[in-house]
From Swiss-Prot:
Organism: Marinobacter nauticus (strain ATCC 700491 / DSM 11845 / VT8) (Marinobacter aquaeolei)
Keyword Nucleotidyltransferase: yes
SUPFAM superfamilies per UniProt: Nucleotide-diphospho-sugar transferases
Enzyme class, first EC level, given as a word: transferase
Location within or outside the cell: Cytoplasm
GO cellular component: cytosol
EC numbers, comma separated: 2.7.7.38
Keywords assigned: Cytoplasm, Lipopolysaccharide biosynthesis, Nucleotidyltransferase, Transferase
Any single biological process term in GO: lipopolysaccharide biosynthetic process
Family: Belongs to the KdsB family.
Recorded name of the encoding gene: kdsB
Name of this protein: 3-deoxy-manno-octulosonate cytidylyltransferase
Amino acid sequence: MSFTVVIPARYASTRLPGKPLAMIAGKPMIQHVCERANESRASRVVVATDDARIEEACRGFGAEVIMTSPNHASGTDRLEEVARKLQLDPDHRVVNVQGDEPLIPPELINQVADNLEQYQEAAIATLCERIHDARQVFNPNVVKVVFDARGMAHYFSRAPIPWARDFWPAGAATQDVDLPDGIGYFRHIGIYGYRASVLSEFVTWLPAPTERVESLEQLRALYNGALIHVDVADRPPAPGVDTEEDLARLRALMEKGGARG
């Protein structure tokens, strides 16, 4: 079955304004993301933006663009608007690829779409990778996920989950713990696949209490009973771009030919 990739791209950014149009190896960042998405098995790749500058740049390299409302409270709301405007069937799969990941492996896009097809009971599919460093487990900027034997998410959190009660002392800090053997710790990777019907439901749900306290939008889906399938990524994800330092590192890497542009 076919699936559509939607790439939300906003010009406004607190830390890096105009990020989608930042030049990397002679191309705007959003073009690199589109090229990677087009290497997946997606039947269609669409950029969703509320900014005319991004629209103009995308049309300049031949991308399909849909202009969306500037008033969306979340990226999922923007995604739902695109699915509605495209008149997608309820069972159609929509993969959300972030516009600041110019090195995203196309294989991960396919993996999310395939998992959504394989696990029909899941409303959403996403990915994770194993954590080997306790500092990441205790880092609130690293979102952890716990899931069951079928890969269905129990919970996502910025806290260290699961807590190793008999292994870590009360008040344990990053510098004085190791990861216990026999249990995996997993970092959530922010790529999602949705069924179009779920997007329509999602935008009707109020923010969940857990979502508000953790600032994690996917908790709204769990709170409302939607199943989220989580799979270990087939290959390591590439880093995204959040800051000027991230951008400088990526430019140096790609301009030296250390990564395909």
